[in-house]
């Protein structure tokens, strides 16, 4: 009875993990068993399992431990036990990246991969390729070629997949195996054919003509593997997108014809892949899309849950790009709302939300509410994203949608789920003025019982930004001050900042805010006390300019670049005053695009956004003498200076400093028989510019990206900074062996290569900024410290106000304010408000009044702290 009771208790506790309490030290000591003779296969398998478990649980072995374990493991090759041998292969693969001298087992693995025991061969190939590098690959090349065309499918697949892995480190050697891969394409085994196509494409993907020939050949043949056909469809789609075939020619394209014929394939997998590919292609018309949507509509009523899920997921993804076509499937989607598979039901209803009429919103929301509590957070986020899109489409329905979202906020859920809801409510508040009051009220209720610190801080920031301009700002004070009393120090500090914004923006509430901030000075936390004292001191001055600069429009510098600038200042001339205005601003928080693809929804933490300037700072810091230029003001996106398929490809990134520009040229040598040295770019400078330094690239081997720099000083006059530069790539060429990459001799010859011209524009020299309250900043700029330039233009190249706004934003490179970059439909008058900082720290505010009649008339007013900058920006439009 006692034994029965113990067994019953163990059963109640659930399954236990026999390896959960392993210690690395004791397991490594057990590896001594591997040296025993004869080999105890059963015991060794158990020890190897422990080692693999520890490694896969994240336990790290130092090189000495891994090497000792590896060499002990090699003794097990004397055993003929099949299971033990395969465990040894797994151990070799896991330890190969840490242990030293792993090539000692090459001969044993080569013997196994060429032996007669098929159970060994495939695993031996995988293990061998995990320890092989490009220097010793030629020794096993003959065996790899034989295995690729082996009659045993498992061996052939292992060789093909291992070849794909080796192609990343020894691409030149693997390219020589193309004939064997081509032969493997004729295999009757579906997996061999699939992997062979994958290897062939990888070998030829850098040669567009070779890929086109491969696809044209295979589309005319009949592939037996549905997996290979699916891959061929994807390759064909990539070629179509790269060629950018116009709509009227696309239907006659052999590639599109092939994809269309796959809609009639006998495999459901291929049919779906073809339909998915067609609906996601650009430049398609209704006639081309119709068969694909018919297939998806048919799959919606399939008895197989996988087909229903695939079809509705694809419809959900393209609902915003092809709403009319998806609407034809609405009846089928309505039927899927009650599907037993909740994932299918969720996708169906979110698709209907994206394409449905305004009158159906209430009915759909009622249907969602019946099962939303039963689905996972992952799919709840999909629902929230669909509601966000619906709010943008039907702003008058914000009350219904906001109430639904507030109900979801009160439910249980993880941080990412709650964040998606808060993001949506904030988006509605920012884009719909009518929804501001109700949105803020819902968020106030949420933070009363919010367990996520990051969300509470975000909401308090929003309340400080939007609350003072609501109809009755005083009603939010209680919610904010409650956080000071009840929350953690981080939230209390955010609440103090929010209170100060009410005091700065609402004179009627200033007296009460001063009392509350005075109480916060007694807080036990240093940060809270310091903030309260700081804001209290500023508010007591009753100076509007201080309110604007230090409370309403606080400096939002990039912390990484601010730290670097301060370190440089401390290492330099301390007598000179530190100028914070030259430090670039932090990346503006931009609302992420709504993902229509449910597979992209993930619970992984979001990495912090890094600006291009922060990314460039550490790399540029390695250049000699770069510190004297100051912090990076702006780094541009890369521009291509050559065609993508030329002998040498060069792209340029412009790093703008206060008085200098650093041209970064990323160079790639695509010729395997050439080794380049002393690579540099020679610029033809416009008048006023001066070259200060050229940093050449010493060596440029085949297929390695290397960088050369040119440092140029701007003219003293800002108006002369807009210019075009000629560029020539100069280098020394040495012939080399394509297999080794080593030059044949020490002697070379000088050569050059002409590059495309480059421009420095106004947008290159301006760092975007975002004003929380543009009108306050504009009014404050009406002073003697600010200078103004004004002009009127007729924009003949554009026909709509939205096109005009987009053009102005592109030319000037400024950040928009108050969502003025979006022009409401049906309007003939619009005002664009934007701001930024010119290199050197000159602030810029722009107000562009647009009127649409027969053309677009623009009245542009620019205010800046520098007259030359104001005139330069005005001239840029003309």
Curated annotation (Swiss-Prot):
Organism: Drosophila pseudoobscura pseudoobscura
Matches recorded under InterPro entries: ARM-like, ARM-type_fold, Clathrin/coatomer_adapt-like_N, Clathrin_app_Ig-like_sf, Coatomer/calthrin_app_sub_C, Coatomer_g_Cpla, Coatomer_gsu, Coatomer_gsu_app_Ig-like_dom
A single Gene Ontology CC term: COPI vesicle coat
Main location: cytoplasm
Keywords of this entry: Cytoplasm, Cytoplasmic vesicle, Endoplasmic reticulum, ER-Golgi transport, Golgi apparatus, Membrane, Protein transport, Repeat, Transport
GO biological process: endoplasmic reticulum to Golgi vesicle-mediated transport; intra-Golgi vesicle-mediated transport; intracellular protein transport; organelle transport along microtubule; protein secretion
One Pfam family cited in the UniProt record for this chain: COP-gamma_platf
Ranges: HEAT repeats: 64-101, 287-324, 326-359, 360-396, 399-434, 471-508
Entry protein name: Coatomer subunit gamma
Compartments where found: Cytoplasm; Golgi apparatus membrane; Cytoplasmic vesicle, COPI-coated vesicle membrane; Endoplasmic reticulum
GO molecular function: structural molecule activity
Annotated function: The coatomer is a cytosolic protein complex that binds to dilysine motifs and reversibly associates with Golgi non-clathrin-coated vesicles, which further mediate biosynthetic protein transport from the ER, via the Golgi up to the trans Golgi network. Coatomer complex is required for budding from Golgi membranes, and is essential for the retrograde Golgi-to-ER transport of dilysine-tagged proteins. Required for limiting lipid storage in lipid droplets. Involved in the expansion of luminal extracellular matrices and apical membrane during tubulogenesis.
Similarity section: Belongs to the COPG family.
Membrane topology summary: Peripheral membrane protein
This protein's record includes keyword Membrane: yes
Assembly: Oligomeric complex that consists of at least the alpha, beta, beta', gamma, delta, epsilon and zeta subunits.
Keyword set includes Endoplasmic reticulum: yes
């Amino acid at each position: 009875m006692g034994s029965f009771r113990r067994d019953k208790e163990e059963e109640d506790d659930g399954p236990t993990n026999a390896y959960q309490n392993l210690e690395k030290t004791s397991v490594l000591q057990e590896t001594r068993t591997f040296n025993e003779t004869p080999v105890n296969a059963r015991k060794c398998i158990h020890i190897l399992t422990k080692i693999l478990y520890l490694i896969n649980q994240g336990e790290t072995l130092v090189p000495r431990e891994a090497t000792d374990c590896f060499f002990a493991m090699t003794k097990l090759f004397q055993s003929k036990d099949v299971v033990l041998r395969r465990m040894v292969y797994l151990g070799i693969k896991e330890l190969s990246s840490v242990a030293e001298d792993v090539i000692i087992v090459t001969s044993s693995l080569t013997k196994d991969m060429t032996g007669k025991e098929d159970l060994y061969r495939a695993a031996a190939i995988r293990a061998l390729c995990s320890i092989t590098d490009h220097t010793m690959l030629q020794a096993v090349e003959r065996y790899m070629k034989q295995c690729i065309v082996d009659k045993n499918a498992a061996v052939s697949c292992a060789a093909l997949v291992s070849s794909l892995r080796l192609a990343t480190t020894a691409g030149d050697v693997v390219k020589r195996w193309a004939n064997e891969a081509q032969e493997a394409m004729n295999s009757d085994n579906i997996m061999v054919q699939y992997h062979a196509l994958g290897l062939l494409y990888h070998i030829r993907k850098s040669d567009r003509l070779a890929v086109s020939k491969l696809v044209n050949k295979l589309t005319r043949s009949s592939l037996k593997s549905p997996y290979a056909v699916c891959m061929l469809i994807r390759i064909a789609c990539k070629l179509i997108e790269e060629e950018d075939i116009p709509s009227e020619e696309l239907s006659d394209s052999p590639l599109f014809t092939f994809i269309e014929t796959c809609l009639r394939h006998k495999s459901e997998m291929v049919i779906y892949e073809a339909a998915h590919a067609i609906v996601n292609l650009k430049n398609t018309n209704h006639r081309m899309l119709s068969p694909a949507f018919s297939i998806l509509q048919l799959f919606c009523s399939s008895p197989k849950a996988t087909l229903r899920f695939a079809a509705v997921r694809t419809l959900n993804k393209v609902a915003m790009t092809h709403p009319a076509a998806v609407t034809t499937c609405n009846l089928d989607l309505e039927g899927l709302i009650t599907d037993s598979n909740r994932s299918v039901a969720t996708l169906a209803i979110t698709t209907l939300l994206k394409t449905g009429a305004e009158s159906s919103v209430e009915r759909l929301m009622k249907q969602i509410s019946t099962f939303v509590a039963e689905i996972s957070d992952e799919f709840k986020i999909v629902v929230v994203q669909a509601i966000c899109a619906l709010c943008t489409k039907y702003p008058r329905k914000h009350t219904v949608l906001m109430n639904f979202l507030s109900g979801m906020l009160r439910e249980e859920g993880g941080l990412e789920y709650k964040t998606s809801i808060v993001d949506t409510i904030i988006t509605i508040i920012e884009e719909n003025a009518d929804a501001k009051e109700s949105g803020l009220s819902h968020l106030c209720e949420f933070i009363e019982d919010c367990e996520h610190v990051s969300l509470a801080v975000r909401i308090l920031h929003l309340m400080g930004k939007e609350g003072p301009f609501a109809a009755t700002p005083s009603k939010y004070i209680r919610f904010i001050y409650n956080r000071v009393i009840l929350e953690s120090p981080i939230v209390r500090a955010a609440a103090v900042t929010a209170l100060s914004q009410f005091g700065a923006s609402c004179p009627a509430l200033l007296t009460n805010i001063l009392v509350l901030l005075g109480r916060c000075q007694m807080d036990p936390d240093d940060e809270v006390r310091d903030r309260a004292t700081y804001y209290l001191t500023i508010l007591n001055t009753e100076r509007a300019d201080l309110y604007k600069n230090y409370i309403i429009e606080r400096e939002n510098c990039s912390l990484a670049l601010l730290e670097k600038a301060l370190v440089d200042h401390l290492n330099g001339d301390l007598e000179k005053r530190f100028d914070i205005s030259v430090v670039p601003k932090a990346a503006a928080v931009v609302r992420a695009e709504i993902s229509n693809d449910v597979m992209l929804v993930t619970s992984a933490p979001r990495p912090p956004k890094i600006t291009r300037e922060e990314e460039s700072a550490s790399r540029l810091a390695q250049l000699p003498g770069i510190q004297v230029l100051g912090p990076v003001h702006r780094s541009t996106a890369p521009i291509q200076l050559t065609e993508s398929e030329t002998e040498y490809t060069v792209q340029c990134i412009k790093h703008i400093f206060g008085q200098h520009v650093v041209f970064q040229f990323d160079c790639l040598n695509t010729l395997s028989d050439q080794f380049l040295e002393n690579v540099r770019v020679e610029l033809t400078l416009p008048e006023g510019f001066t070259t200060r330094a050229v940093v050449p690239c010493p060596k440029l081997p085949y297929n390695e990206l290397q960088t050369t720099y040119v440092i140029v000083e701007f003219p003293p006059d800002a108006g002369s900074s807009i210019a075009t530069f000629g560029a020539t790539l100069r280098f020394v060429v040495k012939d080399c062996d394509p297999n080794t990459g080593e030059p044949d001799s020490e002697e070379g010859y000088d050569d050059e290569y002409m590059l495309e011209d480059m421009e420095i524009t106004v947008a290159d020299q301006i760092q975007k900024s975002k004003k929380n309250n543009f009108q306050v900043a504009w009014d404050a700029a009406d002073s003697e410290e600010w200078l103004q330039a004004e002009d009127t233009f007729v924009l003949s190249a554009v026909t709509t106000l939205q096109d005009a706004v987009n053009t102005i934003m592109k030319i000037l490179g400024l950040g928009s304010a108050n969502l003025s970059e979006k022009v409401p439909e049906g309007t003939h008058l619009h005002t664009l408000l934007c701001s930024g900082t010119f290199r050197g720290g000159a602030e810029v505010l722009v107000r562009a009044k647009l009127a649409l009649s027969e053309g677009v008339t623009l009245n542009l007013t620019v205010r800046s702290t520098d007259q030359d900058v104001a005139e330069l920006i005005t001239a840029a439009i003309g």
